[in-house]
Amino acid sequence: MQNAFTIDQLPLSWQEQLENEWSQPYMHKLREFLQTEYSRTTVYPAKDNIFTALKSTPFDAVRVVVLGQDPYPGEGQAHGLSFSVPHGVRLPPSLMNIFRELQTDLGIKNTTGCLQPWADQGVLLLNTVLTVRAGAPFSHAGQGWERFTDAIVTKLIENRSHVIFVLWGNAARKKCDLLFRSTHKHAILAAAHPSPLAAHRGFFGCSHFSKINYLLKKLERPMINWKLP
Protein backbone atom coordinates (compact mmCIF):
# COMPACT_ATOMS: atom_id res chain seq x y z
CA MET A 1 0.00 0.00 0.00
CA GLN A 2 2.86 2.37 0.66
CA ASN A 3 3.89 2.49 -3.00
CA ALA A 4 0.30 3.16 -4.08
CA PHE A 5 -0.11 6.01 -1.63
CA THR A 6 2.87 8.29 -2.07
CA ILE A 7 2.85 11.86 -3.30
CA ASP A 8 5.52 10.98 -5.87
CA GLN A 9 2.92 9.43 -8.15
CA LEU A 10 1.13 12.76 -8.63
CA PRO A 11 2.07 15.30 -11.31
CA LEU A 12 4.65 17.75 -10.02
CA SER A 13 2.15 20.60 -10.13
CA TRP A 14 -0.14 18.76 -7.68
CA GLN A 15 2.80 17.75 -5.49
CA GLU A 16 3.72 21.40 -5.08
CA GLN A 17 0.16 22.32 -4.10
CA LEU A 18 -0.50 19.39 -1.75
CA GLU A 19 2.90 18.72 -0.15
CA ASN A 20 1.98 20.30 3.19
CA GLU A 21 -1.45 18.66 3.23
CA TRP A 22 0.09 15.25 2.55
CA SER A 23 2.14 15.44 5.75
CA GLN A 24 -0.76 16.34 8.05
CA PRO A 25 -1.58 13.88 10.89
CA TYR A 26 -5.02 13.10 9.46
CA MET A 27 -3.40 11.91 6.24
CA HIS A 28 -1.20 9.49 8.15
CA LYS A 29 -4.35 8.12 9.80
CA LEU A 30 -6.06 7.86 6.42
CA ARG A 31 -3.13 5.90 4.99
CA GLU A 32 -3.24 3.49 7.94
CA PHE A 33 -6.99 3.06 7.49
CA LEU A 34 -6.59 2.33 3.78
CA GLN A 35 -3.77 -0.11 4.35
CA THR A 36 -6.04 -2.07 6.70
CA GLU A 37 -9.06 -1.86 4.40
CA TYR A 38 -7.24 -2.99 1.27
CA SER A 39 -5.65 -5.90 3.13
CA ARG A 40 -8.85 -7.17 4.75
CA THR A 41 -11.67 -6.50 2.29
CA THR A 42 -12.41 -5.47 -1.27
CA VAL A 43 -12.02 -1.75 -1.89
CA TYR A 44 -12.63 0.28 -5.04
CA PRO A 45 -10.97 1.60 -7.08
CA ALA A 46 -7.78 -0.44 -7.37
CA LYS A 47 -4.91 1.10 -5.41
CA ASP A 48 -3.18 2.36 -8.54
CA ASN A 49 -6.34 4.21 -9.60
CA ILE A 50 -7.05 6.13 -6.38
CA PHE A 51 -5.54 9.32 -7.78
CA THR A 52 -6.46 8.93 -11.44
CA ALA A 53 -8.24 12.30 -11.45
CA LEU A 54 -5.13 14.17 -10.31
CA LYS A 55 -2.84 12.15 -12.56
CA SER A 56 -5.04 12.81 -15.58
CA THR A 57 -5.50 16.54 -15.03
CA PRO A 58 -2.44 18.37 -13.64
CA PHE A 59 -3.08 21.43 -11.48
CA ASP A 60 -2.07 23.92 -14.16
CA ALA A 61 -4.24 22.17 -16.76
CA VAL A 62 -7.54 22.27 -14.84
CA ARG A 63 -10.17 24.25 -16.74
CA VAL A 64 -13.34 22.64 -15.42
CA VAL A 65 -14.09 20.85 -12.13
CA VAL A 66 -16.92 18.31 -11.87
CA LEU A 67 -17.40 17.09 -8.30
CA GLY A 68 -18.79 13.66 -7.47
CA GLN A 69 -19.43 12.03 -4.09
CA ASP A 70 -17.72 8.66 -3.65
CA PRO A 71 -16.70 5.95 -6.14
CA TYR A 72 -19.18 3.47 -7.57
CA PRO A 73 -19.29 0.49 -5.16
CA GLY A 74 -19.92 -2.18 -7.79
CA GLU A 75 -17.30 -4.55 -9.17
CA GLY A 76 -15.37 -3.14 -12.12
CA GLN A 77 -17.06 0.26 -12.07
CA ALA A 78 -14.79 2.71 -10.24
CA HIS A 79 -11.50 3.72 -11.84
CA GLY A 80 -10.70 7.03 -10.19
CA LEU A 81 -12.75 9.55 -12.19
CA SER A 82 -16.06 10.85 -10.86
CA PHE A 83 -19.13 9.51 -12.72
CA SER A 84 -16.89 7.53 -15.12
CA VAL A 85 -16.65 3.76 -15.70
CA PRO A 86 -14.08 1.80 -17.71
CA HIS A 87 -14.71 0.86 -21.33
CA GLY A 88 -17.19 -1.99 -21.70
CA VAL A 89 -18.87 -1.46 -18.33
CA ARG A 90 -22.62 -0.89 -18.24
CA LEU A 91 -23.53 2.77 -17.73
CA PRO A 92 -24.69 3.59 -14.18
CA PRO A 93 -27.97 5.55 -13.90
CA SER A 94 -26.33 8.89 -13.06
CA LEU A 95 -24.02 8.66 -16.06
CA MET A 96 -26.94 7.70 -18.29
CA ASN A 97 -28.68 10.90 -17.19
CA ILE A 98 -25.53 12.94 -17.81
CA PHE A 99 -25.38 11.58 -21.35
CA ARG A 100 -29.11 12.20 -21.81
CA GLU A 101 -28.62 15.87 -20.91
CA LEU A 102 -25.56 16.11 -23.16
CA GLN A 103 -27.56 14.79 -26.10
CA THR A 104 -30.42 17.22 -25.41
CA ASP A 105 -27.99 20.10 -25.00
CA LEU A 106 -25.54 19.56 -27.85
CA GLY A 107 -26.89 16.62 -29.83
CA ILE A 108 -23.93 14.47 -28.82
CA LYS A 109 -24.68 10.80 -28.19
CA ASN A 110 -22.11 8.87 -26.17
CA THR A 111 -22.31 5.12 -25.66
CA THR A 112 -19.10 4.43 -23.74
CA GLY A 113 -18.85 5.47 -20.10
CA CYS A 114 -15.11 6.13 -19.89
CA LEU A 115 -14.69 9.88 -19.38
CA GLN A 116 -10.89 9.81 -19.63
CA PRO A 117 -10.91 12.01 -22.78
CA TRP A 118 -12.71 14.72 -20.80
CA ALA A 119 -10.06 14.53 -18.07
CA ASP A 120 -7.31 14.74 -20.69
CA GLN A 121 -8.81 18.04 -21.88
CA GLY A 122 -8.69 19.68 -18.45
CA VAL A 123 -11.90 18.49 -16.82
CA LEU A 124 -11.02 17.46 -13.25
CA LEU A 125 -13.43 14.63 -12.42
CA LEU A 126 -12.98 14.60 -8.67
CA ASN A 127 -14.89 12.62 -6.07
CA THR A 128 -15.23 14.02 -2.55
CA VAL A 129 -14.22 10.61 -1.14
CA LEU A 130 -11.71 8.68 -3.24
CA THR A 131 -12.28 5.10 -2.06
CA VAL A 132 -15.19 2.86 -1.05
CA ARG A 133 -15.71 -0.63 0.33
CA ALA A 134 -17.30 -2.99 -2.20
CA GLY A 135 -21.08 -2.85 -2.10
CA ALA A 136 -21.17 -0.22 0.65
CA PRO A 137 -21.71 3.36 -0.55
CA PHE A 138 -20.20 6.07 1.68
CA SER A 139 -18.33 3.42 3.72
CA HIS A 140 -15.11 5.46 3.58
CA ALA A 141 -16.75 8.75 4.43
CA GLY A 142 -15.44 10.51 7.51
CA GLN A 143 -11.96 8.98 7.31
CA GLY A 144 -10.12 12.04 6.02
CA TRP A 145 -10.80 12.10 2.30
CA GLU A 146 -13.22 15.02 2.64
CA ARG A 147 -10.55 17.20 4.20
CA PHE A 148 -8.02 16.23 1.54
CA THR A 149 -10.36 17.00 -1.34
CA ASP A 150 -11.38 20.23 0.42
CA ALA A 151 -7.71 21.18 0.17
CA ILE A 152 -7.68 20.39 -3.55
CA VAL A 153 -10.71 22.60 -4.15
CA THR A 154 -9.28 25.38 -1.98
CA LYS A 155 -5.95 25.35 -3.84
CA LEU A 156 -7.78 25.71 -7.14
CA ILE A 157 -9.93 28.54 -5.82
CA GLU A 158 -6.99 30.44 -4.34
CA ASN A 159 -4.19 29.76 -6.80
CA ARG A 160 -5.96 29.53 -10.15
CA SER A 161 -8.23 31.89 -12.08
CA HIS A 162 -11.14 31.37 -14.46
CA VAL A 163 -11.85 27.77 -13.51
CA ILE A 164 -15.41 26.61 -14.20
CA PHE A 165 -16.86 24.76 -11.21
CA VAL A 166 -19.76 22.44 -12.04
CA LEU A 167 -21.78 21.70 -8.91
CA TRP A 168 -24.38 18.96 -9.27
CA GLY A 169 -26.37 18.45 -6.07
CA ASN A 170 -26.29 19.91 -2.58
CA ALA A 171 -23.17 18.01 -1.50
CA ALA A 172 -21.13 19.58 -4.30
CA ARG A 173 -22.47 23.04 -3.46
CA LYS A 174 -21.58 22.62 0.19
CA LYS A 175 -18.13 21.39 -0.78
CA CYS A 176 -17.51 24.61 -2.66
CA ASP A 177 -18.91 27.03 -0.10
CA LEU A 178 -15.65 28.99 -0.26
CA LEU A 179 -16.16 29.35 -3.99
CA PHE A 180 -19.19 31.56 -3.55
CA ARG A 181 -16.94 34.17 -1.97
CA SER A 182 -14.54 34.06 -4.94
CA THR A 183 -16.91 34.51 -7.86
CA HIS A 184 -14.79 37.29 -9.35
CA LYS A 185 -12.10 34.70 -10.13
CA HIS A 186 -14.17 31.71 -11.21
CA ALA A 187 -17.41 30.65 -12.87
CA ILE A 188 -20.05 28.53 -11.15
CA LEU A 189 -22.65 26.29 -12.80
CA ALA A 190 -25.03 24.64 -10.34
CA ALA A 191 -27.90 22.19 -10.81
CA ALA A 192 -29.55 19.18 -9.20
CA HIS A 193 -27.64 15.89 -9.02
CA PRO A 194 -27.96 13.65 -12.11
CA SER A 195 -29.11 10.65 -10.05
CA PRO A 196 -32.56 9.25 -10.94
CA LEU A 197 -33.89 10.60 -7.63
CA ALA A 198 -32.93 14.20 -8.38
CA ALA A 199 -32.35 14.67 -12.11
CA HIS A 200 -35.90 15.87 -12.80
CA ARG A 201 -35.53 18.60 -10.19
CA GLY A 202 -33.24 20.76 -12.28
CA PHE A 203 -30.48 18.67 -13.81
CA PHE A 204 -32.36 17.95 -17.01
CA GLY A 205 -32.41 21.16 -18.98
CA CYS A 206 -29.42 22.75 -17.23
CA SER A 207 -27.46 22.92 -20.53
CA HIS A 208 -24.17 22.87 -18.63
CA PHE A 209 -22.14 21.37 -21.47
CA SER A 210 -22.91 24.18 -23.90
CA LYS A 211 -22.53 26.75 -21.12
CA ILE A 212 -19.06 25.44 -20.27
CA ASN A 213 -17.96 25.81 -23.87
CA TYR A 214 -19.54 29.27 -24.10
CA LEU A 215 -17.53 30.37 -21.07
CA LEU A 216 -14.32 28.84 -22.41
CA LYS A 217 -14.85 30.57 -25.75
CA LYS A 218 -15.29 33.91 -23.95
CA LEU A 219 -11.96 33.27 -22.24
CA GLU A 220 -10.41 32.48 -25.65
CA ARG A 221 -9.61 28.96 -24.51
CA PRO A 222 -10.19 25.72 -26.43
CA MET A 223 -13.65 24.29 -25.94
CA ILE A 224 -14.20 20.78 -24.58
CA ASN A 225 -14.95 18.04 -27.10
CA TRP A 226 -17.64 16.15 -25.21
CA LYS A 227 -17.89 13.39 -27.82
CA LEU A 228 -16.25 10.19 -26.56
CA PRO A 229 -14.45 7.86 -28.98
Curated annotation (Swiss-Prot):
Keywords for this protein: Cytoplasm, DNA damage, DNA repair, Hydrolase
Classification via SUPFAM superfamilies: Uracil-DNA glycosylase-like (SSF52141)
UniProt-annotated catalytic positions: 70
Taxonomy, superkingdom: Bacteria
GO molecular function: uracil DNA N-glycosylase activity
Family to which the UniProt record says this protein belongs: Belongs to the uracil-DNA glycosylase (UDG) superfamily. UNG family.
InterPro entries, sorted: UDG_fam1, Ura-DNA_Glyclase_AS, Uracil-DNA_glycosylase-like, Uracil-DNA_glycosylase-like_sf
EC top class, as a word: hydrolase
Reactions that this protein is recorded to catalyse: Hydrolyzes single-stranded DNA or mismatched double-stranded DNA and polynucleotides, releasing free uracil
One GO term describing the cellular component: cytoplasm
Enzyme Commission number(s) of this protein: 3.2.2.27
Task of the protein: Excises uracil residues from the DNA which can arise as a result of misincorporation of dUMP residues by DNA polymerase or due to deamination of cytosine.
Name listed for the protein in its UniProt record: Uracil-DNA glycosylase
Cell compartments where the protein resides: Cytoplasm
GO biological process: base-excision repair, AP site formation via deaminated base removal
Pfam families: UDG (PF03167)
